[in-house]
Swiss-Prot record:
Subunit text: Homohexamer.
GO annotation (BP), single: regulation of carbohydrate metabolic process
EC number of the protein: 2.7.11.-, 2.7.4.-
Protein's gene: hprK
PANTHER family in the cross-refs: HPR KINASE_PHOSPHORYLASE, PROTEIN YJDM-RELATED
CDD domains hit by this protein: HprK_C
A GO-annotated cellular component: cytosol
Additional remark text: Both phosphorylation and phosphorolysis are carried out by the same active site and suggest a common mechanism for both reactions.
Protein's UniProt keywords contain Cell membrane: no
Domain of life: Bacteria
Location of the region described as Important for the catalytic mechanism of both phosphorylation and dephosphorylation in the Swiss-Prot/TrEMBL record: 206-215
Region spans: Important for the catalytic mechanism of dephosphorylation: 269-274
Protein name stated in the entry: HPr kinase/phosphorylase
Domain notes: The Walker A ATP-binding motif also binds Pi and PPi.
């Protein structure tokens, strides 16, 4: 698992929706941002720096700007001395409000990128929080194929040559959608959600032995692919081994841990004659039912227990007399 960071320059140059413009501190554009949370200094500007989150991006909204621009030069100098006494990665003023000259001077001297945006504070925080959540999410790479089947994101795993790509190709031909083939990039966006995607280089492509590299979007159309998908089920394809037990009732609920998240796991034996694509389709539909609270295996088990209990009572009519 990796915990990536992001440079201030990435925010400035790669996210036009933020509307950022650099005013000072260009030499600090390589500063790393390692936290998705942001901070509005607010009370800290009055001199209360207890628990000041200096390692976060500092956002100056209308309130902060109104406060510092209403101070006397002496007060503002004191505010700047205290505020810039902390190690800061970058400062952003929203609503297009220009920071006072003393802020620009300190940022230029200390190498702290100082930027402004015409976007409102609320909208800006919403935008940048989403960007940071996606960019800083814990991530890992996993060998397999990620495909959307009936709206369920399924990660097909298994040894090389077991038939993952061929199974996925058959599913795509049936109208389902490819997300990633061979290497799946997985990110944890929350405590219980994993998103799978593909690298830009491999996006929309598959490798099929005997055919080579295929562009799925060109062959099957734009509706056959998507860029990312929530991972809700792992189907592990295994070669059939005599004597090995596989779940035959569905009462077991095995899971596999990915980035600290437990994902439902199904092990499917592969042998000549088995229609794996239709098994995957059925597993997807069954997973949708389970999300709605319906579990066929448990319902059948309850009916069977009631049937056996009823039969036992009928065979022993004097037991309750």
């Amino acid at each position: 698992m990796s915990m990536p960071g992001i440079n201030v320059s990435n925010l400035l140059n790669e996210h036009e929706e933020l509307g950022l413009r650099l005013l000072a501190g260009q030499k600090g554009l390589t500063n790393r941002i390692n936290m998705s949370e942001i901070n509005r200094p607010g009370l800290s500007l009055t001199g209360f720096y207890e628990s000041f989150a200096h390692d976060r991006i500092q956002i100056f909204g209308k309130g902060e700007w109104a406060y510092i621009t209403s101070r006397t030069p002496e007060d503002l100098e004191k505010i700047a001395a205290e505020f810039f006494g902390f190690h800061l990665n970058c400062i952003i003023f929203t609503h297009g409000n220009m920071p006072p000259p003393i802020f620009m001077e300190n940022c230029e001297k200390l190498g702290i990128p100082l930027m402004i945006s015409e976007v409102s504070t609320h909208k800006f925080i919403t935008l940048i929080s989403g960007i940071l959540d996606r960019s800083l999410a814990p991530r890992t790479m996993r060998h397999g194929v990620l495909i959307e089947v009936f709206g369920i994101g399924i990660l097909l795993s298994g040894k090389s040559g077991v038939g993952k790509s061929e199974t996925a190709l058959e599913l795509i031909e049936r109208g389902h959608r490819l997300v990633a083939d061979d290497m799946v990039e997985i990110r944890r966006l929350s405590e219980s959600y994993l998103i799978g995607t593909c690298s830009d280089l491999l996006r929309h492509h598959m490798e099929i032995r005997g055919l080579g590299i295929l562009n799925i979007k060109d062959i099957f159309g734009i509706g056959s692919v998507r860029d990312h998908k929530l991972i809700e089920l792992i189907i592990h394809l295994e070669e059939w081994t005599e004597g090995k037990d596989f779940d035959r009732t569905g009462l077991e609920n095995p899971t596999e841990e990915l980035l600290g998240v437990q994902i439902p796991l199904i092990r499917v034996p592969v042998r000549p004659g088995r229609n794996i694509p239709i098994i995957v389709e059925t597993a997807a539909m069954n997973q949708r039912l389970r999300k709605l609270g319906k579990n066929a295996a448990q319902e059948f088990n309850q009916k069977l227990s009631q049937y056996l209990q009823q039969g036992k009572v009928e065979r022993n009519p004097t037991q309750n007399q």
